[in-house]
């Protein structure tokens, strides 16, 4: 650590050995700017003092112009990229700002490039036939404009140059383009892959980044130059994961193309395709269907049609080949030696050149490789704002209403006083109702105590979690700044112990889940203030409050009627027996009275 501090103070960010630092003084080099001292040397001090003295003597005074400090790094990131969320990765010490973003294809319109291109007229870029080539007559003309034509047109018209090369962003990956599985509904991003190469040739298809770099170093763009012109390889680092139909999309139907072939000895030439063997063998070797010039093409997918495989000057070995699934686009190669690509060009905000696991907010000078498409960047998982938007836009139908349970407030009594064994025994024997009431009261107070205790605990944990989160953010920002400064001054992983390995445990997600679980668990304790209404809501689902009150009234009336039906026979029997007793007693009274009168006579 002392050697690093010493090297930093002496102004030499380069790597020096201990032996050289002890034996020889460190010398500066005028040719290498990285060896220039960061702090003034003794000679520079003398020159500065002399200039100050001269200015004081002559009376010449100059205003001090303070350099404008750069803005916040993260705000600059958001303004330049249009991203409000991002994260850093420490997988590579040489790339401390590797992002955790992924690329997604996005529909491109000419209006998005207004102010960045010479003109936005890309309406005459041509079309792509998806069923038959134009050389086959009599068939359907099912044409559409794939996205790569519009992308190529706009990229060739970029006219806003950048001062420096656009910074490269290392992505976790990018989304593949969709396949064409429905010929009547082609996606707005289908066939959006483009490739960059000198003279717009398909020579570098499937090449790795390293292989392409080595080839271009040995073979310059211009054969007249003895040195290689500057170029930027835009092929993905993991190119084997971002190539072919798995990345650029595929055409799910057969494409019929005429093979007008000529024979020269044992070789055949069919347009741009040539080689030994019959063209029919080439077609069937790729899984296609061969139809010679004497037959008709009968196809049922994507719809039924019949076409004649005829043409002018067809040789004996000519015919039509129904090729299997074709990679899209068919030939989107852009010549990167044109004038518009000699300097880096700017792209509109929030639009990126995405090439697999690499992205640029602009077009580098003389790009070579691919495949690439224009799109946007997003987080691998939705952030909190996206989740809230999804919940706000989601359908609210079919939600089951909760019971009318009110939470315990802060004014409830939490004084728990339990009875002893003697009181419980006498109360349960002599007054069971009093014992039950006492038990219910103590249960309510225990619930109140539990709620208050849980609220205090969650509040305390919430404050601690906020403090830990703020400390974590500060530590990560400071560590990222320190690593960036050390790497910028040439210090690698071996200079500072633990520089490339920084383990800061992150249990915030687990803590947040448990914290939310505690809050939900507290809400499980409540008082059911309307048991009948809760029962009705549970039976009939999400009914309104007016329906609940109506059902409660009907239920009350039904209960009254049932009580009357049950009690009315008993009441009538009691009344009739009472009347009968009264009548019998009256009759008995009159009988006794008559007997008494008869005896008196």
Curated annotation (Swiss-Prot):
Source organism (scientific name): Rous sarcoma virus subgroup C (strain Prague)
Name of the protein in its database record: Envelope glycoprotein gp95
Positions bearing carbohydrate: 79, 121, 142, 159, 179, 182, 226, 260, 292, 298, 308, 316, 383, 393, 455, 503
Cysteine pairs bridged by disulfides in the record: 87-501, 122-153, 193-248, 261-270, 355-372, 412-448, 493-500
Biological process terms in GO annotation: fusion of virus membrane with host plasma membrane; symbiont entry into host cell; virion attachment to host cell
Location of the region described as Fusion peptide in the Swiss-Prot/TrEMBL record: 420-440
Keyword Transmembrane helix (UniProt): yes
CDD domains: RSV-like_HR1-HR2
């Amino acid at each position: 650590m002392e050697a690093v501090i010493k090297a930093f103070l002496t102004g030499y960010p380069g790597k020096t050995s201990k032996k050289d630092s002890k034996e020889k003084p460190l010398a500066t080099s005028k040719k290498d700017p990285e060896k220039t001292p960061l702090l003034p040397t003794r000679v520079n001090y003398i020159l500065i003092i002399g200039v100050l003295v001269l200015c004081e003597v002559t009376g010449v005074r100059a205003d001090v112009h303070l350099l404008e400090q750069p803005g916040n790094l993260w705000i600059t990131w958001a303004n330049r990229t249009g991203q409000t969320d991002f994260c850093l990765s420490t997988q590579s010490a040489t790339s401390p700002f590797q992002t955790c973003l992924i690329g997604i294809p996005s529909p491109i319109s000419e209006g998005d490039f207004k102010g960045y291109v010479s003109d936005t007229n890309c309406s005459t870029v041509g079309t792509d036939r998806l069923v038959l080539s134009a050389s086959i007559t009599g068939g359907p003309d099912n044409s559409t404009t794939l996205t790569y034509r519009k992308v190529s047109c706009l990229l060739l018209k970029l006219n806003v140059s950048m001062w420096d090369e656009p910074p490269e962003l290392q992505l976790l990956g990018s989304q593949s383009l969709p396949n064409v599985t429905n010929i009547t509904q082609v996606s707005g991003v289908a066939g959006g892959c483009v490739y960059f190469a000198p003279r717009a040739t398909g020579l570098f298809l499937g090449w790795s980044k390293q292989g392409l770099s080595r080839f271009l170093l040995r073979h310059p763009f211009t054969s007249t130059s003895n040195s290689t012109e500057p170029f930027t390889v835009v092929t993905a680092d993991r190119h084997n994961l971002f190539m072919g139909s798995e990345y650029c999309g595929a055409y799910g139907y057969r494409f019929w193309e005429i093979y007008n072939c000529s024979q020269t000895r044992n070789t055949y030439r069919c347009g741009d395709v040539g080689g030994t063997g019959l063209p029919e063998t080439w077609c069937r070797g790729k899984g296609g269907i061969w139809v010679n010039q004497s037959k008709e093409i009968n196809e049922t997918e994507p719809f039924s049609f019949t076409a004649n495989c005829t043409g002018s000057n067809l040789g004996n070995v000519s015919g039509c080949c129904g090729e299997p699934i074709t990679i899209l686009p068919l030939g989107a190669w852009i010549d990167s030696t044109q004038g518009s690509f000699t300097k880096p060009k700017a792209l509109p905000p929030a639009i990126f050149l995405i090439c697999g696991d690499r992205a640029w907010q602009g077009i580098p000078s003389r790009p070579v490789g691919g495949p690439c498409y224009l799109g946007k960047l997003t987080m691998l998982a939705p952030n909190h704002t996206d989740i809230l938007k999804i919940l706000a836009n989601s359908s609210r139908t079919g939600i089951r209403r909760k019971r009318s349970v009110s939470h315990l407030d802060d004014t409830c009594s939490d004084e728990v006083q339990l009875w002893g064994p003697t009181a419980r025994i006498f109360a349960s024997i002599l007054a069971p109702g009093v014992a039950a009431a006492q038990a219910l009261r103590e249960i309510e107070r225990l619930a109140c105590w539990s709620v208050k205790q849980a609220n205090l605990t969650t509040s305390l944990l919430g404050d601690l979690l906020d403090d830990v989160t703020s400390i974590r953010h500060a530590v990560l920002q400071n560590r990222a700044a320190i690593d960036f400064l050390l790497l910028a001054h040439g210090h690698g992983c071996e200079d500072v112990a633990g520089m490339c390995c920084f383990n800061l445990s992150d249990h915030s997600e687990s803590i947040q889940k448990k914290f939310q679980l505690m809050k939900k668990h507290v809400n499980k304790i409540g008082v059911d203030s309307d048991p009948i209404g809760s029962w009705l809501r549970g039976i009939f689902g999400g009914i309104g409050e007016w329906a609940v009150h109506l059902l409660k009234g009907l239920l009350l009336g039904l209960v009254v009627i049932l009580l009357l039906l049950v009690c009315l026979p008993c009441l009538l029997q009691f009344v009739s027996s009472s009347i009968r007793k009264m009548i019998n007693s009256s009759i008995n009274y009159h009988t006794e009275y008559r007997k008494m009168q008869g005896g008196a006579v």
